[in-house]
Amino acid sequence: MPEPKLHKIERIVVRGTNWVGDAVMTVPALRNLRRLFPNSHITLATRSLAKDLFSEAEFLDDLLVHEGGGLRSVVHQVRDWRRRNFDLAVLLPNSIETALVASLARVPIRIGYATDGRQRLLTHPLDLPDWRSSQHEVFYYLNIIARLEWLVNREQTFLNTQPDASLEVAETRKIAALDFLRHNRIKGITDGRLLIAICPGSINSRAKRWPAERYAALADRFIDECGADILLIGSAAEEAVSLEVSERMRNNPVMLTGKTELAELVAVLSLVDLLVTNDTGPAHIAAALGRPTLVIFGPTNPLTTRPFSPLAEIVRSAPDCAPCMLRECPIDHRCMTAIQPDEVFERARIMLGRRKMADERPFSACPQTQPLPEFNNKLEFIEQIK
């Protein structure tokens, strides 16, 4: 029999993940939670770093922002959660802190993975799935909601249907982004030239960065051969990397690194024809927005963390030592240095040639030198990464 308490859930809190890319990968789980509890009030507790991703999410009712760590943060969160009288806590991160907050806040039903010694703090602890290292992270988060589905309805459909990882940007924000780009003298938004964003940094891992001189060579080629406008994007912490790329270029890119809040960056990415990036948060954002996204992978595992979209492709050399998951390479960074600008440009050229995969806005794509290969449809893509 289904658990009766779960049919009376009125107020739900979801403890979100801490990094932007991870937050995007939780979207299918959040969307299916709304399907499971269509009339409940759902609050997402998240850090300010990720809150702007969800400000317009139709599957959420409220955002609860928290910062910092340690005892003070725990006390603050416990007070906030108690005041809101949540009936159910869905804990997406694996930390003991998140389970401690839910337990001390006296949330009656607490579900999450039984990791980090927190099993006794959860009312519904889940074992880690044995497939975690071989399936996409989207399914790791979705598995928690699938367990809830079983407890409520005695059926599991969420893991057998195509997850929806898409995000939308309101027209008003797109218009504001257009004005922002005009202010930065981006002509391509009005005359049909390609608008290509490049994210050469990575906040939490130097090993994930493709060399700056190669990004510079790639960007120059986009400008010389495709007539593209180039946007260098990233957070303030990545400004030095973007400056190095800019200084190594013959042409002039537009430096947006460190000049946009996440909400502005999301809106700008919704307008680009292509994003070329390392394995970073913007890769997941652009793909979720339905923009063609080319990700250069090195030490991380694309099987589990590539952007969850058929519009996202990867370039990878895959030496024997990859994926090592290290943040600093102890040897010669061969997973990244083996990838040449010509290889990335050719893949990008093919992606840009698929006009049907982008918006109908006309642009002058790079010249095609060979027929375009067929692209897998969305269902086939999902089967490849499950």
Regions found by a protein language model. Give the residues of each.
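Catalytic machinery of carbohydrate-active enzymes
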Residues: M1-K386
